[in-house]
Amino acid sequence: LVRYLSGGSPLPLDQPLPIYTIMFFQNIIGMLLISAWIWKTKQFKLELNTNRPWLHTFRIITAALGIGLWYLSLRYIPVTQVVALSFIAPIITVLAAVLILRENFDLQRKIAVILSISGGFLIARPDRALINSTIYSWYMLLPLLAAFVFSLDKVLTRELLKQYESPRALTWYLLTFIAPLSLLPMLYYGWVSPTTEHLPWLLLLGSLGALAHYAFNKAYELAEVTFLLPFGAAKLIICALASYIIFFEIPKTFDMWLGITVITLSTMVLSINAKFFNKFSKQPLPLAS
């Protein structure tokens, strides 16, 4: 939807919108929808009441900072190199989840994470981007910092939900804070009003964005970070499928198809009964009689 509204798709659009305008309306619509949902439960104050205001604040800051660093990276570094350097994010996330949250990282999850990272690597081929890179400045640190901050955001989300915070509350706090920030680019670039042609798509985009944030938080309420991480790589498959259905774009490289297959295997590994992997785990040696 963002690609279509910004004029980057082959589908016709009379007046493309700037990215910052799309993001502003997406966040505003998402905030209004999640507010209406909480209000309908008649527990608005109760659900938004929190005993961890500073942890909420820290999480919101990390989310906003991560987005800012990501967009700043795209300003100074080619997209392929930003994506390449961002491949360190799953590794940082796993380390943070194991060291900070003390999550289980058994053989089954290790295999799934390794497969998902490998599949993403095959699709994006960050090695080619880095080999061809001519940028050797501090700008290269920006996507690395963004990856670190996004990983910290996942850990903070899981920690808040472990302390019985509501997934809807986390979604509301995030969108309510980020929506006003979306106005900042307009102070520099100027306001661009959407037309009636844009409004249905912006409404759909805002709804899907709010749903995605809520689903993300709900998932982290129900499962550990190390378990959910391989499923995040599946978005590459979904994006490829959406590109085929909407834009008629078919992956043409063998690496792309191989990467999709490997990521699919990573999610299948997590569906296998854990008892199967316990057979291969290290067992204590029997004591001598």
Feature locations, PLM:
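Residue-level recognition of pore/gate-forming positions within transmembrane alpha-helices
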Residues: 27-31, 87-91, 113-120, 175-179, ...
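Membrane-interface interhelical linkers
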Residues: 7-12, 19, 25-58, 131-135, ...
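Hydrophobic alpha-helical transmembrane segments in multi-pass integral membrane proteins
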Residues: 1-3, 68-73, 121-132, 178-192, ...
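Helix-helix packing/entry segments at the starts of transmembrane helices
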Residues: 82-88, 160-177, 213-245
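Hydrophobic/small/kink-forming positions within alpha-helical transmembrane segments
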Residues: 28, 60-68, 90-95, 121, ...
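Loop-to-transmembrane alpha-helix entry segments
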Residues: 86, 102-122, 133, 137-139, ...
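C-terminal-most transmembrane helix of multi-pass membrane proteins
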Residues: 233-289
